[in-house]
Amino acid sequence: MATLSQDQKQLVQEKAKAIRVSIVQSVTAAKSGHPGGSLSIADVMSLLYFVEMNVDPSNPKKQDRDRFVLSKGHAAPALYATLAEKGYFPKSELINLRKINHFLQGHPDMKHTPGVDMSTGSLGQGISAACGMALAGKIDNADYRVYSILGDGELEEGQVWEAAMFAGHYKLNNLTAFVDYNGLQIDGDIEKVMSPLPIPDKFKAFKWNVIEVNGHDIDELHQAIEEAKAFTDGPTCIVMHTVKGKGVAEMEGQAGWHGKAPSEEQGVAFVNEIMGVQ
């Protein structure tokens, strides 16, 4: 399997840092939002959009594009930051996050936001839609792949497992799902709220190929995605061991930052921390 070049790896790391900066800035400006679970997926978002996926900001609806569905729709700040970084719309728009009548709503809206393939927010519906897209691709003999990111708390939704059963039954080998396994949800530790563990075994039971990785290691993520592309017997689930709030020490591993915005002073400090400014 092909490894990342140094240039590719550097690009992904630089874009992940830029995505994290934009997440903090946009949520701070909005005075509301979900920074913790947005920061935890910045690395995989950067890798997908700047290396792995076949997408074109100048033609966002092209038929042969790869599809992406953010099933954990509350992490919209990460998706918007990535889309802006990729060139779907100006980065200056990010400060309008969650403003009434703006195209960057609190959860992804496919009718108004360039580059968004599916409206999400109600947990469990995103992965279900991703399964439908993947099946449509099979029926049409299309070459595109479908990627979806789920939260670990989202796995408490029964609809997720209906979708998992569906994907395994139809052997949707053009579908790759990522689980953002940071161990925390809005009410605290996922094992105490409603444990979805063991996550790998559950997906394996539904005939998925399962790979576990460090969700902040670009090389591990890339190799897992390459393996998913090569696997022909069904869908792949990449379980990413991540840190909620990754990149901001005060947020890391803290459930309290699931849906809380930084103050203006904190926002400046957090951005400086991400950028390495003393």
Name every feature range the model reports, one short phrase each.
Residues A42-L47, P77-A81, I127-L135:
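Contiguous, well-ordered alpha-helical segments that form the cores/surfaces of helical PPI scaffolds
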Residues Y80-F89:
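Alpha-helical support elements that line or immediately flank enzyme active sites
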Residues P90-D109:
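Anionic-ligand anchoring segments at beta-strand to alpha-helix junctions in alpha/beta enzyme folds, i.e.
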Residues V55-R67, F103, H107-Q278:
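Glycine-rich ThDP/TPP pyrophosphate-binding loop and its adjacent helix/strand module
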Residues P35, L94, C237:
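Flexible, glycine/charged-enriched surface loops at secondary-structure junctions
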Residues A2-A76:
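N-terminal amphipathic, basic-rich helices that act as targeting or association modules
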Residues S5, K9-V12, A16, R20, ...:
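Generic structural signal for well-ordered, non-membrane alpha-helical segments
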